[in-house]
């Protein structure tokens, strides 16, 4: 996964963000929060550990977006949902024998995001909702037996479709719907088709949920992750979620290589498989990423390919450029074809911990009941990390 992607890729499951969460789940989340923090402080004292350390971090990431759906267009300022603005706190304690205990909180700031913007509703606003919560977990790590995580956070398959060395993930990666996911395709007569970019372009990557997760210690570059959990931030989803993933990471003399594959079960009627691989050539900066996924119950699938070049041409910082292609079948319904291509450039400004970026993407949908026009999206923006 793009590491800070919002990913942002979770689909709403029938609840308005301001509706009350079921009391049982609210209490469960609060109890987990208290347990996590007490564990991270209490066990530290019991284990004769070093003094615990706090780390505060965050980012602001805004872009100017121009969207043209073939019938109208608009330009607006929005939070970039490829990697939304956020803040986080880590409380970490080193225990004996290399063991480590960590409490991790992370939340979006609540700015209106690019994935929710439409041509009719795209004003930049600020309204925090509980769905902004990204991480609220306690993590216990050991050098030999791996890592155990409990609370709101990444499931085992989060990131399996998003392995990427390009350095352009802030402007485009395999979750290509994040730039303008709520934009609707229109017919040549100007009528809305009822199909949005979100519906026609998905990468089947995993999500963040309230879960128990185990990650094995790496062995010759390989690692295994498994998780079980449920959705507690959105009302109306009572399914149990189970995820299993295999990862591979190697840093070789000339190349860096990463691969991911994962299988996710959502209740008894839906399962998805997704995978990705990325290669980076150190001497030239050339890089490649490939991802694919399939929803087992519907047969919907896709393939994604990205080519990039990352070099330090100027003293300001590293420059990354990339081009990608996406092709999906049956994502918007049986017989539909979703195609997209995109360009991106990111310039790092090391002195100010900032990335300046620009990108363009074309979305094409064929095979629907009626012909629809392409949607074009362009963006320029900046991400500042602190």
What name fits each language-model region?
Residues 45-54, 94-101, 144-145, 220-221, ...:
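Short loop/turn motifs that connect adjacent beta-strands in outer-membrane beta-barrel proteins
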Residues 54-62, 101-105, 148, 222-226, ...:
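Transmembrane beta-strands of outer-membrane beta-barrel proteins
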Residues 88-90, 137-140, 213-215, 245-247, ...:
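Outer-membrane beta-barrel architecture
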Residues 75-85, 131-134, 206-210, 238-242, ...:
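Residues that define the transmembrane beta-barrel architecture of outer-membrane proteins
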Residues 241-343, 348:
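Detector for outer-membrane/organellar transmembrane beta-barrel domains
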Residues 62-68, 107-111, 154-156, 228-232, ...:
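Transmembrane beta-strands of outer-membrane beta-barrel pores
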Residues 48-66, 76-231, 238-240, 248:
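Outer membrane beta-barrel
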Residues 2-5, 9-14, 244, 374-386:
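Outer-membrane beta-barrel "beta-signal"
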